């Protein structure tokens, strides 16, 4: 069977915590249109808190539940609204594609020291220096949990 997917967001999707409610309220309409899969934006807390589009991952387990990065809700809503939206899609046989960025993190809570090398910008395998110590925000403590 061929399905039809909708990407239910774009970079400029309005915030204010309303997207998950919109998805929930439109689930039956989407099914009537023949939609079989819905691609939703990252649901977790990003470094930009309530303004994050989700591609600056801070806490992959905060779906709009904890007071972190200046907000409780994410740009798209809170955990309860998200789970209700996914359940509404499921009830009308629309699958959910969950977008999760796993290969980087942003907005560490504390600094850590570690060694780095200066490298050739055109070839990262070509070291231009001996290792030296730097300090950067790479420690995540999630104090809002």
Where are these regions (language model features)?
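Substrate-binding/active-site clefts of carbohydrate-active enzymes
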Residues: 2-25, 32-36, 40-145
């Amino acid at each position: 069977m061929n399905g039809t997917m909708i990407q239910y967001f774009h970079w400029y999707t309005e915030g204010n915590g309303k997207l998950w409610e919109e998805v929930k309220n439109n689930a039956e309409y989407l099914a009537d249109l023949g939609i079989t899969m819905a691609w939703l934006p990252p649901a977790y807390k990003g470094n930009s808190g309530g303004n994050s589009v989700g591609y600056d991952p801070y806490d992959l387990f905060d779906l709009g539940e904890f007071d972190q990065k200046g907000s409780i809700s994410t740009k798209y809503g809170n955990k309860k609204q998200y789970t209700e939206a996914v359940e509404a899609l499921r009830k009308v046989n629309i699958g959910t594609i969950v977008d999760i960025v796993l290969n980087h993190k942003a907005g560490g809570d504390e600094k850590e020291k570690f060694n780095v090398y200066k490298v050739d910008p055109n070839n990262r395998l070509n070291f231009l220096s001996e290792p030296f110590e730097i300090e950067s925000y790479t420690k995540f403590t999630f104090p809002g949990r």
